[in-house]
Amino acid sequence: MSRSLRLTVILVLSFCFAILAACRPQLSDAKIKTSQLSLVTPSDPTTFNYAMNTSPYSVFPFIYQGLVKENGINNKLEPALAESWKVSEDRLKITFTLRDKLKWSDGKPLTVDDVMFTYKDVYFNEKIPTLFKDSLRIGKKDVFPSIRKLDKRRIEFALPQPFTPFLRESASLAILPAHALRDSVLSNDANGNPRFISTWGTDTSPEKIIVNGAYQIESYTPSERVIFKNNPYYWRKDGQGKQLPYIKSIVWQIIPSTDNHLLRFRSGELDSLNVKPETFSLLKREEKRGKFTIHNGGLETGISFVTFNLNQASNSQGKPFVNPIKSRWFHNLAFRQAIAYAIDRERMKTNIYRGIGELQYSPIAEQSPYYLSPKQGLKTYSYNPRKARKILTEAGFQYNAQRQLLDKDGLAVKFNILVKSEDESRIALAVQVQEDLNNIG
Protein backbone atom coordinates (compact mmCIF):
# COMPACT_ATOMS: atom_id res chain seq x y z
CA MET A 1 0.00 0.00 0.00
CA SER A 2 1.10 3.56 -0.55
CA ARG A 3 -0.34 6.93 0.24
CA SER A 4 0.19 10.28 -1.40
CA LEU A 5 0.44 13.60 0.35
CA ARG A 6 -2.64 15.71 -0.17
CA LEU A 7 -1.47 18.62 -2.31
CA THR A 8 -3.97 21.26 -3.24
CA VAL A 9 -3.62 24.36 -5.33
CA ILE A 10 -5.39 27.40 -3.97
CA LEU A 11 -5.86 30.34 -6.31
CA VAL A 12 -7.14 32.98 -3.88
CA LEU A 13 -4.05 34.13 -1.98
CA SER A 14 -5.83 34.70 1.33
CA PHE A 15 -6.82 31.02 1.58
CA CYS A 16 -5.20 28.75 4.12
CA PHE A 17 -6.86 25.43 5.00
CA ALA A 18 -10.32 26.81 4.47
CA ILE A 19 -11.34 24.41 1.75
CA LEU A 20 -8.60 22.10 0.56
CA ALA A 21 -11.01 19.75 -1.17
CA ALA A 22 -14.69 19.60 -1.93
CA CYS A 23 -15.12 16.77 0.53
CA ARG A 24 -13.90 18.79 3.52
CA PRO A 25 -16.20 21.83 3.87
CA GLN A 26 -16.08 21.57 7.67
CA LEU A 27 -12.88 23.60 7.46
CA SER A 28 -14.87 26.63 6.32
CA ASP A 29 -14.40 28.53 9.59
CA ALA A 30 -11.10 30.02 8.41
CA LYS A 31 -11.41 33.77 7.81
CA ILE A 32 -11.82 33.92 4.07
CA LYS A 33 -12.70 37.20 2.42
CA THR A 34 -14.37 36.07 -0.78
CA SER A 35 -18.05 35.59 -1.49
CA GLN A 36 -17.94 32.76 -4.05
CA LEU A 37 -15.82 29.69 -4.57
CA SER A 38 -15.57 27.52 -7.68
CA LEU A 39 -14.74 23.84 -7.06
CA VAL A 40 -14.86 20.68 -9.15
CA THR A 41 -16.26 17.16 -8.86
CA PRO A 42 -15.81 14.31 -11.37
CA SER A 43 -19.37 13.03 -11.13
CA ASP A 44 -22.98 14.13 -10.74
CA PRO A 45 -24.65 13.55 -7.38
CA THR A 46 -26.85 10.45 -7.47
CA THR A 47 -29.39 11.57 -4.87
CA PHE A 48 -30.29 14.40 -2.50
CA ASN A 49 -31.44 11.87 0.10
CA TYR A 50 -28.58 11.44 2.57
CA ALA A 51 -29.71 8.04 3.84
CA MET A 52 -29.90 6.56 0.33
CA ASN A 53 -26.55 7.81 -0.95
CA THR A 54 -23.92 5.30 -2.09
CA SER A 55 -21.65 7.62 -4.08
CA PRO A 56 -18.39 9.21 -2.85
CA TYR A 57 -19.29 12.31 -4.88
CA SER A 58 -22.17 13.74 -2.90
CA VAL A 59 -23.52 17.11 -1.83
CA PHE A 60 -24.00 16.06 1.78
CA PRO A 61 -20.77 17.31 3.41
CA PHE A 62 -21.88 20.80 2.37
CA ILE A 63 -25.49 20.61 3.53
CA TYR A 64 -25.71 18.33 6.58
CA GLN A 65 -24.16 17.83 9.99
CA GLY A 66 -24.51 15.21 12.69
CA LEU A 67 -24.29 15.40 16.46
CA VAL A 68 -20.49 15.45 16.29
CA LYS A 69 -17.92 16.03 13.55
CA GLU A 70 -14.28 15.23 12.90
CA ASN A 71 -11.80 18.09 12.72
CA GLY A 72 -10.35 18.06 9.21
CA ILE A 73 -6.85 19.00 10.38
CA ASN A 74 -6.20 17.06 13.58
CA ASN A 75 -8.94 14.39 13.20
CA LYS A 76 -10.24 15.00 16.72
CA LEU A 77 -13.96 14.83 17.48
CA GLU A 78 -15.69 18.16 17.95
CA PRO A 79 -19.23 19.24 18.85
CA ALA A 80 -21.54 19.88 15.90
CA LEU A 81 -25.31 19.94 16.42
CA ALA A 82 -24.64 18.60 19.91
CA GLU A 83 -22.80 21.12 22.06
CA SER A 84 -21.56 18.36 24.38
CA TRP A 85 -21.79 14.67 25.20
CA LYS A 86 -21.19 12.53 28.26
CA VAL A 87 -20.20 8.85 28.39
CA SER A 88 -21.24 6.83 31.43
CA GLU A 89 -18.60 5.13 33.57
CA ASP A 90 -19.57 1.69 32.25
CA ARG A 91 -19.42 3.11 28.67
CA LEU A 92 -22.88 1.78 27.92
CA LYS A 93 -24.70 5.11 27.77
CA ILE A 94 -23.90 8.28 25.84
CA THR A 95 -25.93 11.41 26.48
CA PHE A 96 -25.89 14.24 23.93
CA THR A 97 -27.01 17.79 24.63
CA LEU A 98 -28.16 19.73 21.57
CA ARG A 99 -27.25 23.35 21.02
CA ASP A 100 -29.97 25.78 21.98
CA LYS A 101 -32.27 27.24 19.33
CA LEU A 102 -31.08 25.15 16.38
CA LYS A 103 -33.03 25.61 13.14
CA TRP A 104 -33.48 23.90 9.80
CA SER A 105 -32.86 25.79 6.56
CA ASP A 106 -36.61 26.54 6.33
CA GLY A 107 -36.50 28.24 9.73
CA LYS A 108 -38.29 25.51 11.67
CA PRO A 109 -36.79 24.31 14.98
CA LEU A 110 -34.32 21.42 14.97
CA THR A 111 -35.01 19.40 18.11
CA VAL A 112 -34.35 16.13 19.91
CA ASP A 113 -37.40 14.78 18.06
CA ASP A 114 -35.45 15.09 14.80
CA VAL A 115 -32.62 13.04 16.29
CA MET A 116 -35.10 10.40 17.48
CA PHE A 117 -36.70 10.30 14.02
CA THR A 118 -33.36 10.07 12.21
CA TYR A 119 -32.04 7.09 14.11
CA LYS A 120 -35.16 5.23 15.21
CA ASP A 121 -37.36 5.71 12.13
CA VAL A 122 -34.75 5.90 9.37
CA TYR A 123 -31.32 4.50 10.25
CA PHE A 124 -32.63 1.63 12.42
CA ASN A 125 -35.51 0.91 10.02
CA GLU A 126 -35.03 -2.55 8.46
CA LYS A 127 -37.15 -1.50 5.47
CA ILE A 128 -34.79 1.33 4.55
CA PRO A 129 -31.52 -0.08 3.08
CA THR A 130 -28.89 2.48 4.07
CA LEU A 131 -25.26 1.87 3.18
CA PHE A 132 -24.14 2.34 6.79
CA LYS A 133 -26.86 0.31 8.55
CA ASP A 134 -24.58 -2.60 9.46
CA SER A 135 -22.05 -0.25 11.05
CA LEU A 136 -24.76 0.78 13.54
CA ARG A 137 -25.21 -2.78 14.78
CA ILE A 138 -23.27 -3.66 17.91
CA GLY A 139 -22.06 -6.89 19.48
CA LYS A 140 -22.35 -10.54 18.53
CA LYS A 141 -26.12 -10.23 18.25
CA ASP A 142 -25.84 -7.29 15.82
CA VAL A 143 -28.38 -5.13 17.64
CA PHE A 144 -28.99 -1.41 17.31
CA PRO A 145 -28.52 0.88 20.31
CA SER A 146 -31.69 1.97 22.06
CA ILE A 147 -32.45 5.68 22.03
CA ARG A 148 -34.37 7.73 24.59
CA LYS A 149 -35.44 11.37 24.81
CA LEU A 150 -34.51 12.79 28.22
CA ASP A 151 -35.80 16.34 27.78
CA LYS A 152 -36.12 18.99 25.07
CA ARG A 153 -32.36 19.18 24.50
CA ARG A 154 -30.93 15.87 25.74
CA ILE A 155 -31.01 12.43 24.17
CA GLU A 156 -29.50 9.17 25.40
CA PHE A 157 -28.12 6.22 23.43
CA ALA A 158 -27.84 2.93 25.33
CA LEU A 159 -25.38 0.42 23.86
CA PRO A 160 -25.58 -3.37 24.39
CA GLN A 161 -21.85 -3.36 25.11
CA PRO A 162 -19.01 -0.79 25.08
CA PHE A 163 -18.36 0.20 21.48
CA THR A 164 -15.65 2.81 20.95
CA PRO A 165 -16.39 3.57 17.25
CA PHE A 166 -19.95 4.69 18.06
CA LEU A 167 -19.01 8.30 18.75
CA ARG A 168 -16.86 8.79 15.67
CA GLU A 169 -18.86 6.75 13.18
CA SER A 170 -22.48 6.64 14.32
CA ALA A 171 -22.87 10.01 16.04
CA SER A 172 -21.44 11.84 13.03
CA LEU A 173 -24.24 10.70 10.70
CA ALA A 174 -26.46 13.50 9.40
CA ILE A 175 -29.56 14.44 11.37
CA LEU A 176 -32.62 14.55 9.08
CA PRO A 177 -35.75 16.77 9.25
CA ALA A 178 -38.70 14.86 10.71
CA HIS A 179 -41.23 17.49 9.62
CA ALA A 180 -40.20 17.10 5.97
CA LEU A 181 -39.62 13.34 5.78
CA ARG A 182 -41.78 11.58 8.37
CA ASP A 183 -44.76 11.06 6.03
CA SER A 184 -42.53 9.40 3.41
CA VAL A 185 -41.25 6.95 6.04
CA LEU A 186 -44.72 6.04 7.29
CA SER A 187 -46.32 5.52 3.86
CA ASN A 188 -45.54 2.93 1.18
CA ASP A 189 -45.26 2.96 -2.59
CA ALA A 190 -46.97 0.52 -4.99
CA ASN A 191 -44.34 -2.13 -4.23
CA GLY A 192 -44.88 -1.92 -0.49
CA ASN A 193 -41.62 -0.09 0.19
CA PRO A 194 -41.41 3.14 2.21
CA ARG A 195 -41.80 6.16 -0.08
CA PHE A 196 -38.77 7.56 1.71
CA ILE A 197 -36.51 5.37 -0.44
CA SER A 198 -37.43 7.32 -3.59
CA THR A 199 -37.85 10.70 -1.87
CA TRP A 200 -35.51 13.59 -2.64
CA GLY A 201 -33.99 12.29 -5.85
CA THR A 202 -31.87 14.67 -7.91
CA ASP A 203 -35.00 15.75 -9.80
CA THR A 204 -36.41 17.30 -6.61
CA SER A 205 -36.70 21.09 -6.52
CA PRO A 206 -33.80 22.40 -4.39
CA GLU A 207 -36.09 24.46 -2.14
CA LYS A 208 -37.71 21.24 -0.95
CA ILE A 209 -34.40 19.85 0.35
CA ILE A 210 -34.36 20.88 4.03
CA VAL A 211 -30.87 20.89 5.56
CA ASN A 212 -28.92 21.88 8.68
CA GLY A 213 -25.40 22.43 7.33
CA ALA A 214 -23.49 25.52 6.27
CA TYR A 215 -25.01 25.47 2.78
CA GLN A 216 -28.21 24.58 0.98
CA ILE A 217 -28.72 23.67 -2.67
CA GLU A 218 -29.64 26.66 -4.82
CA SER A 219 -29.72 24.89 -8.19
CA TYR A 220 -28.61 21.75 -9.98
CA THR A 221 -27.92 21.45 -13.71
CA PRO A 222 -27.15 17.80 -14.57
CA SER A 223 -23.68 17.20 -16.06
CA GLU A 224 -22.82 20.87 -15.52
CA ARG A 225 -22.92 22.17 -11.94
CA VAL A 226 -24.45 22.30 -8.49
CA ILE A 227 -24.69 25.75 -6.93
CA PHE A 228 -24.83 26.05 -3.14
CA LYS A 229 -25.87 29.13 -1.20
CA ASN A 230 -25.32 29.79 2.48
CA ASN A 231 -27.90 28.53 4.96
CA PRO A 232 -29.12 31.64 6.83
CA TYR A 233 -30.08 29.49 9.84
CA TYR A 234 -26.75 27.69 10.20
CA TRP A 235 -25.84 27.59 13.88
CA ARG A 236 -22.18 28.54 13.68
CA LYS A 237 -20.77 32.05 14.26
CA ASP A 238 -17.23 33.37 14.51
CA GLY A 239 -15.61 34.87 17.60
CA GLN A 240 -17.18 38.25 16.88
CA GLY A 241 -20.65 36.77 16.51
CA LYS A 242 -20.68 37.00 12.70
CA GLN A 243 -22.70 34.38 10.83
CA LEU A 244 -20.69 31.65 9.12
CA PRO A 245 -19.79 30.60 6.49
CA TYR A 246 -17.92 33.60 5.12
CA ILE A 247 -18.15 32.19 1.61
CA LYS A 248 -21.77 32.75 0.60
CA SER A 249 -21.84 30.68 -2.59
CA ILE A 250 -20.07 27.60 -3.95
CA VAL A 251 -20.20 26.57 -7.60
CA TRP A 252 -19.48 22.85 -7.85
CA GLN A 253 -18.56 22.20 -11.48
CA ILE A 254 -19.16 18.66 -12.76
CA ILE A 255 -16.19 17.69 -14.96
CA PRO A 256 -15.45 13.96 -15.41
CA SER A 257 -11.95 14.30 -16.90
CA THR A 258 -9.09 15.09 -14.52
CA ASP A 259 -7.19 16.50 -17.51
CA ASN A 260 -9.97 19.05 -17.90
CA HIS A 261 -9.76 19.82 -14.17
CA LEU A 262 -6.18 20.94 -14.75
CA LEU A 263 -7.07 22.96 -17.85
CA ARG A 264 -9.94 24.72 -16.07
CA PHE A 265 -7.73 25.58 -13.12
CA ARG A 266 -4.92 26.94 -15.25
CA SER A 267 -7.43 29.09 -17.14
CA GLY A 268 -8.74 30.54 -13.88
CA GLU A 269 -12.15 28.85 -13.94
CA LEU A 270 -11.48 26.87 -10.74
CA ASP A 271 -10.31 28.23 -7.40
CA SER A 272 -9.00 24.93 -6.06
CA LEU A 273 -7.46 21.76 -7.43
CA ASN A 274 -6.28 18.51 -5.91
CA VAL A 275 -2.81 18.06 -7.36
CA LYS A 276 -2.05 14.71 -8.99
CA PRO A 277 1.50 13.30 -8.79
CA GLU A 278 1.89 13.54 -12.56
CA THR A 279 1.00 17.27 -12.61
CA PHE A 280 2.86 18.40 -9.50
CA SER A 281 6.09 19.39 -11.31
CA LEU A 282 4.20 21.43 -13.92
CA LEU A 283 2.14 23.33 -11.37
CA LYS A 284 5.09 23.90 -9.06
CA ARG A 285 6.94 25.63 -11.91
CA GLU A 286 3.89 27.81 -12.60
CA GLU A 287 3.16 28.63 -8.96
CA LYS A 288 4.63 32.14 -8.85
CA ARG A 289 3.64 33.17 -12.38
CA GLY A 290 0.13 31.78 -11.94
CA LYS A 291 -0.35 33.58 -8.61
CA PHE A 292 -1.47 30.48 -6.77
CA THR A 293 0.00 28.51 -3.87
CA ILE A 294 0.40 24.76 -3.50
CA HIS A 295 -0.37 23.75 0.07
CA ASN A 296 0.84 20.47 1.53
CA GLY A 297 -2.25 19.22 3.34
CA GLY A 298 -0.52 16.22 4.89
CA LEU A 299 -1.19 12.56 4.31
CA GLU A 300 -4.45 11.47 2.75
CA THR A 301 -6.57 9.04 4.72
CA GLY A 302 -7.14 6.98 1.59
CA ILE A 303 -4.76 4.27 0.40
CA SER A 304 -3.84 2.51 -2.83
CA PHE A 305 -3.92 -1.25 -2.50
CA VAL A 306 -4.17 -4.60 -4.27
CA THR A 307 -7.06 -6.82 -3.26
CA PHE A 308 -7.90 -10.37 -4.33
CA ASN A 309 -11.40 -11.52 -5.23
CA LEU A 310 -12.21 -14.11 -2.55
CA ASN A 311 -15.81 -14.56 -3.65
CA GLN A 312 -16.55 -18.30 -3.83
CA ALA A 313 -20.18 -17.91 -4.88
CA SER A 314 -21.69 -18.88 -8.25
CA ASN A 315 -24.15 -17.20 -10.59
CA SER A 316 -27.69 -18.41 -11.31
CA GLN A 317 -26.32 -20.90 -13.86
CA GLY A 318 -24.00 -22.41 -11.28
CA LYS A 319 -20.84 -20.91 -12.78
CA PRO A 320 -18.36 -19.63 -10.15
CA PHE A 321 -17.74 -15.89 -10.25
CA VAL A 322 -14.02 -16.60 -9.77
CA ASN A 323 -12.17 -19.41 -11.55
CA PRO A 324 -11.81 -22.16 -8.89
CA ILE A 325 -8.12 -22.62 -9.75
CA LYS A 326 -7.37 -18.93 -9.20
CA SER A 327 -9.64 -18.90 -6.17
CA ARG A 328 -7.48 -21.62 -4.61
CA TRP A 329 -4.39 -19.43 -5.08
CA PHE A 330 -6.09 -16.32 -3.71
CA HIS A 331 -7.31 -18.12 -0.58
CA ASN A 332 -3.79 -19.33 0.17
CA LEU A 333 -2.34 -17.07 2.88
CA ALA A 334 1.24 -17.82 1.84
CA PHE A 335 0.42 -16.77 -1.74
CA ARG A 336 -0.92 -13.41 -0.58
CA GLN A 337 2.06 -12.88 1.73
CA ALA A 338 4.46 -13.59 -1.12
CA ILE A 339 2.70 -11.02 -3.29
CA ALA A 340 3.08 -8.46 -0.50
CA TYR A 341 6.83 -9.10 -0.28
CA ALA A 342 7.17 -8.90 -4.07
CA ILE A 343 5.88 -5.32 -4.47
CA ASP A 344 8.50 -2.56 -4.30
CA ARG A 345 6.67 0.26 -2.53
CA GLU A 346 9.76 2.45 -2.24
CA ARG A 347 10.06 2.50 -6.04
CA MET A 348 6.39 3.49 -6.24
CA LYS A 349 7.00 6.34 -3.84
CA THR A 350 10.01 7.57 -5.81
CA ASN A 351 8.84 7.08 -9.40
CA ILE A 352 5.07 7.53 -9.22
CA TYR A 353 4.57 9.88 -6.28
CA ARG A 354 7.79 11.84 -6.99
CA GLY A 355 9.00 11.15 -3.47
CA ILE A 356 6.01 12.93 -1.96
CA GLY A 357 4.32 10.19 -0.02
CA GLU A 358 4.65 7.67 2.77
CA LEU A 359 4.47 3.89 2.84
CA GLN A 360 1.34 2.47 4.41
CA TYR A 361 1.25 -1.05 5.80
CA SER A 362 -2.25 -0.99 7.26
CA PRO A 363 -5.77 -0.40 5.90
CA ILE A 364 -6.23 1.96 8.86
CA ALA A 365 -4.91 5.48 8.24
CA GLU A 366 -2.08 6.79 10.37
CA GLN A 367 -4.30 9.67 11.53
CA SER A 368 -6.80 7.26 13.06
CA PRO A 369 -6.75 6.73 16.84
CA TYR A 370 -7.00 3.00 16.07
CA TYR A 371 -3.84 2.90 13.95
CA LEU A 372 -1.14 0.44 15.03
CA SER A 373 2.34 1.45 13.86
CA PRO A 374 5.18 -0.93 12.95
CA LYS A 375 6.97 0.25 16.10
CA GLN A 376 3.95 -0.89 18.11
CA GLY A 377 4.02 -4.35 16.57
CA LEU A 378 2.30 -4.06 13.19
CA LYS A 379 3.66 -6.72 10.83
CA THR A 380 5.15 -5.22 7.69
CA TYR A 381 6.05 -6.66 4.29
CA SER A 382 9.12 -4.82 3.05
CA TYR A 383 10.26 -5.48 -0.50
CA ASN A 384 12.00 -8.86 -0.59
CA PRO A 385 11.50 -10.85 -3.83
CA ARG A 386 13.86 -13.60 -2.66
CA LYS A 387 11.70 -14.17 0.41
CA ALA A 388 8.57 -14.08 -1.79
CA ARG A 389 9.93 -16.91 -3.96
CA LYS A 390 10.91 -18.93 -0.88
CA ILE A 391 7.41 -18.59 0.62
CA LEU A 392 5.85 -19.72 -2.65
CA THR A 393 8.00 -22.82 -3.02
CA GLU A 394 7.43 -23.76 0.62
CA ALA A 395 3.68 -23.45 -0.01
CA GLY A 396 3.82 -26.00 -2.85
CA PHE A 397 4.33 -23.70 -5.83
CA GLN A 398 7.19 -24.47 -8.21
CA TYR A 399 9.26 -22.92 -11.00
CA ASN A 400 9.84 -24.35 -14.47
CA ALA A 401 13.02 -24.02 -16.51
CA GLN A 402 11.94 -20.57 -17.71
CA ARG A 403 11.53 -19.43 -14.05
CA GLN A 404 7.79 -19.16 -14.55
CA LEU A 405 5.69 -19.80 -11.45
CA LEU A 406 3.49 -22.90 -11.48
CA ASP A 407 1.04 -24.18 -8.88
CA LYS A 408 1.24 -27.66 -7.34
CA ASP A 409 -0.66 -29.08 -10.34
CA GLY A 410 1.78 -27.56 -12.83
CA LEU A 411 -0.57 -24.79 -13.98
CA ALA A 412 0.95 -21.39 -14.78
CA VAL A 413 0.05 -18.73 -12.23
CA LYS A 414 -1.58 -15.86 -14.12
CA PHE A 415 -4.35 -13.42 -13.20
CA ASN A 416 -5.69 -10.04 -14.27
CA ILE A 417 -5.51 -6.75 -12.38
CA LEU A 418 -8.38 -4.33 -12.87
CA VAL A 419 -7.63 -0.64 -12.40
CA LYS A 420 -9.51 2.64 -12.83
CA SER A 421 -8.50 3.81 -16.28
CA GLU A 422 -9.19 7.51 -15.61
CA ASP A 423 -6.48 7.74 -12.92
CA GLU A 424 -2.96 7.92 -14.36
CA SER A 425 -1.22 7.29 -11.05
CA ARG A 426 -3.28 4.15 -10.45
CA ILE A 427 -2.42 2.88 -13.92
CA ALA A 428 1.25 3.50 -13.16
CA LEU A 429 0.88 1.61 -9.88
CA ALA A 430 -0.73 -1.34 -11.67
CA VAL A 431 2.05 -1.41 -14.28
CA GLN A 432 4.69 -1.55 -11.57
CA VAL A 433 2.80 -4.29 -9.70
CA GLN A 434 2.81 -6.26 -12.95
CA GLU A 435 6.57 -5.75 -13.33
CA ASP A 436 7.26 -6.74 -9.72
CA LEU A 437 5.14 -9.88 -9.97
CA ASN A 438 6.82 -10.84 -13.24
CA ASN A 439 10.05 -10.70 -11.25
CA ILE A 440 8.86 -13.61 -9.09
CA GLY A 441 7.53 -15.60 -12.01
Model-predicted segments: where are they?
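Extracytoplasmic/periplasmic ligand-capture domains
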Residues: 22-29, 72-73, 99-129, 143-147, ...
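Short, low-complexity disordered leader/linker segments with a strong preference
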Residues: 1-35, 146, 401, 405
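Residue-level recognition of beta-strand termini and adjacent short loop/turns
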Residues: 88-89, 151, 222
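Surface-exposed binding/hinge segments that line
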Residues: 134-192
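Hydrophobic residues in beta-strands and at strand termini
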Residues: 41, 81, 87, 97-98, ...
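A structural "hinge/loop" feature
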Residues: 41-58, 81, 108, 131, ...
